[in-house]
């Protein structure tokens, strides 16, 4: 896989992961915790695909292959980092929503 194609796949998978994470957040806000957790699983799968590409590139560079770092790859890495952070934060927010829902159920008994 050439560097430009790898960067495009990184952007695509990272972008999908980020979108799925925010879909999960919106579901959690509606009290649909189970559905939100399923979306997070999908987001993790897209993140694994992106991370696999990144790892492959890092290994190639460690083996001595040289890459010309361009704006596209910087952009791709930015997408990856943002998607990872978004998913981690959304997971924590989902946990908070789940706890709040449980407390509300206890109060309304």
Give a label for each model feature.
Residues 1-109:
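Terminal alpha-helical segments
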